[in-house]
Design a protein with these regions (language model features):
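A short-motif feature that recognizes glycine-rich, charge-decorated loops
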Residues: 1-163
Length: 163
């Protein structure tokens, strides 16, 4: 075997080994991904309940592709705002910890600042984290850290978009 052929073969083996290692690392990283808050598709959610601290509970239901507030006389809600709340189900979790690792009062979960219930699955929102723009969210017996972007706001309030 010529020297040039042997060098190309060694180079090819090194490239194949690097590709195998990169594939293994990507698969390992994907398995370690914390996932989302809930295993619900935001588009399939049909019932939302929102309780903000100091406010009465608001109930919403999706009918014929539009959101309706069902407290008292049913009235149309702002679809975009309710879609934002439904999107919270798919919020990317930065990290999960057992609820037993925290004192609920110290992270704003005794009582929670907001309770968002999506198709019967409650999400309890606490204080912002001191480590960055994140919120503590209790989901069952676990606490998640999620972006502040997913902090529930009242869908009844109109907002102005800045351009």
């Amino acid at each position: 075997m010529k020297r040039a052929t042997r060098q190309r073969l060694i180079l090819l083996l090194v490239v194949v080994a690097l590709l195998v290692l990169a594939g293994w690392q990507l698969r390992r990283d994907a398995q370690g991904e914390p996932g989302t808050l809930l295993a619900l598709d935001p588009h399939s959610i049909s019932h939302i309940t929102l309780t903000l601290s100091g406010s009465p509970t608001m109930h919403y239901e999706k009918r014929d592709g539009h959101w309706w507030r069902t407290d008292g006389t049913p009235e149309r809600a702002i679809d975009g705002r309710l879609a934002e709340l439904a999107d919270t189900a798919a919020a990317r979790v930065l990290s999960w910890r057992p609820a037993s690792d925290f004192d609920p009062a110290k992270i704003g979960l005794a009582p929670p600042q907001a309770i968002l219930t999506l198709d019967g699955q409650p999400l309890e929102f606490g204080e912002s984290s001191v480590t960055g723009p994140q919120h503590f969210v209790r989901v069952g017996q676990r606490i998640a850290l999620v972006s502040l972007h997913y902090t529930p706001r009242s869908p009844a309030l109109k907002t102005t978009e800045l351009h």
